[in-house]
Amino acid sequence: MGPCGALGLGLLLAAVCGAAAPELHTLRYIQTAMTDPGPGQPWFVTVGYVDGELFVHYNSTARRYVPRTEWIAAKADQQYWDGQTQIGQGNEQIDRENLGILQRRYNQTGGSHTVQWMYGCDILEGGPIRGYYQMAYDGRDFTAFDKGTMTFTAAVPEAVPTKRKWEEESEPERWKNYLEETCVEWLRRYVEYGKAELGRRERPEVRVWGKEADGILTLSCRAHGFYPRPIVVSWLKDGAVRGQDAHSGGIVPNGDGTYHTWVTIDAQPGDGDKYQCRVEHASLPQPGLYSWEPPQPNLVPIVAGVAVAIVAIAIMVGVGFIIYRRHAGKKGKGYNIAPGSNPAI
């Protein structure tokens, strides 16, 4: 099946998209259980993403897996949906128990609490396969599966009993098999199902600009209108990535099915020419580099002033010439020969 079977304890909500690459594909399931979801809201929700696109959804109100894309609705049969629904209902029941266990372990008697899981895999054609299985409680890391060492990592003391229990119950073997076999098999199948949509490529339109205030030059790089969702936008200074100094706005969907994102970085006013924005996306044959160009001095007022001066001079010359002609004409009338007079001899 697509999602794993009923799970034990266990993840912090992580990015749905993987690193940008021409043939990278990702499958992610994010599962959330809440003690206090709010009026009219389901307390348990699972969503699935292929290449960053939401394709399935389950919640504790409907209690069924439902499609969120046309391609999965068209390709998956009823047996698939019945099987996924059975898994969703099993995970829902286990997370109801998990919320109670964690509240007792943390000595909590009430309040709003949340368990989050993220699990899935990435495949890069001709490259490595990566798998993830993590858990968080109340927004903090709780435990994660290390596929390399076949162990679970306890991020907090309260997670140690869970780590021991899972390792004694052979959970590492089960999750290794899921992440390397089952997950990859279903990801390839989903990519085949949705190849017409998932294979679409829209190049990002990139704009770089800067704004100086209080002695700091803030450089911004915005990529707009790209598809698929995975993208890497980073700032370079003298050719070196400045990841820790940059701030990202996240990847946000547009109304037309594409996405946009932006990344900013602060620099010294005189260092703007040392920075470049690098954009990596499946639609680009190679990473694009974009530089900030400082605005040129505004020549419009100068040109306008010169033009006004030229016009003024022209008007003055014209007026002066007219006055001169009129004055010269008046002098000429006093010396004209009278009509019919003979010339002097």
Swiss-Prot record:
Tagged with keyword Transmembrane helix: yes
Chief location: membrane
InterPro entries per record: Ig-like_dom, Ig-like_dom_sf, Ig-like_fold, Ig/MHC_CS, Ig_C1-set, MHC_class-I_related, MHC_I-like_Ag-recog, MHC_I-like_Ag-recog_sf
GO cellular component: external side of plasma membrane; extracellular space; MHC class I protein complex
Region (Alpha-3): 202-292
Keyword Transit peptide among record annotations: no
Domain Ig-like C1-type, chain residue ranges per copy: 204-293
Membrane topology of the entry: Single-pass type I membrane protein
Cytoplasmic side of membrane: 325-345
Positions of transmembrane segments: 302-324
Region Alpha-2, annotated ranges: 111-201
One Gene Ontology biological process: antigen processing and presentation of peptide antigen via MHC class I
CDD domains: IgC1_CD1 (cd21029)
Record's keyword terms, sorted: Disulfide bond, Glycoprotein, Immunity, Membrane, MHC I, Signal, Transmembrane, Transmembrane helix
Positions in the Extracellular compartment: 23-301
Pfam annotation, one family: C1-set
Region (Alpha-1): 23-110
Region (Connecting peptide) residue spans: 293-301
Glycosylation sites per record: N59, N107
Disulfide bonds: C121-C183, C221-C277
Description of how the protein assembles with itself and partners: Heterodimer of an alpha chain and a beta chain (beta-2-microglobulin).
Role: Involved in the presentation of foreign antigens to the immune system.
PANTHER family: MAJOR HISTOCOMPATIBILITY COMPLEX CLASS I-RELATED GENE PROTEIN (PTHR16675:SF242), MHC CLASS I-RELATED (PTHR16675)
UniProt family annotation: Belongs to the MHC class I family.
Protein name: Class I histocompatibility antigen, F10 alpha chain
Lineage: Eukaryota, Metazoa, Chordata, Craniata, Vertebrata
